[in-house]
Amino acid sequence: MSSSIIVPYLERYGTEEQKKKYLPKCVSGEITTAIGMTEPGIGSDLAGMRTTAVRDGDHYIINGQKTFISNGINAGLFFICVKTDLTATPAHKGISILLVEDGTPGFSRGRKLKKLGQHSTDTAELIFEDVRVPVSNLLGEEGKGFYYLMDKLQQERIMIAIGALVVAEEMLKTTMTFVKERHAFGKPISSFQNTQFEMAEMATEISMAQTFVDDLTYRHMNGENVSTQVSMDIIAKNLGM
């Protein structure tokens, strides 16, 4: 997740100074990254976020909370979405992204959240109380954060859909083995017509989703904007849930 979803923000929009400082450590695994979008009571409604960053000379002062943040406990570098312009119309034009290092005064972690799956990454709450970060930690341009997110969320959603499809394919293989080995009324349940219908439907849905995701991946890698189609791949992701 850190290298395939979050680091591309730095590679695409970071300054040369930021890249030289952080990219080698990201590549070596010395630090992992996390991105903070979701907030308590707001969810992923970016325009409604309440975490603010107020300019104070050569620094921004961050106040607010984030929740459901993947890698929140173990990350060493955080890409935090903040409101730098509270009067912007529409509201999403006031969003920026700031780089916050672990250990910055005023930054702390809340609970490590319990979850059903994806235990290879932790999920946590983040708290910002008068956290001062230098202006040089601004990713890209002020007020452009929403556009950066919309660009990179395409890749994030495709990656998640690919992972879900891998899970779905393994589920199909496991189920196929089970119905061949499980016997009822003196014969394997794979010989029952209803079982065959269910297995055929599962295989068909996975094949359709695979074709759809492969097409999105190809178009995205060739620079095409597939944001609308990527929103549709929730269907593909549901196969792996």
Could you describe each region identified by the protein language model?
Residues 1-20, 24-30, 70-77, 220-224:
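Internal helix-loop-helix
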Residues 5, 150-151, 155, 229-241:
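Glycine-rich phosphate/cofactor-binding loops in nucleotide/flavin-utilizing enzymes
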Residues 26, 41-44, 68-71, 88-89, ...:
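Short Gly/Pro-enriched turn/cap motifs at secondary-structure boundaries
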Residues 29-37:
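A short, Trp-centered hydrophobic/proline-enriched beta-strand micro-motif
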Residues 51-54:
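A structural signal for short hydrophobic beta-strand segments in well-ordered beta-sheet cores
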Residues 63-109:
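A short core secondary-structure module
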Residues 107-208:
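Glycine-rich beta->alpha junctions and the first turn(s) of the following alpha-helix
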Residues 200-222:
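Active-site pocket-lining segment
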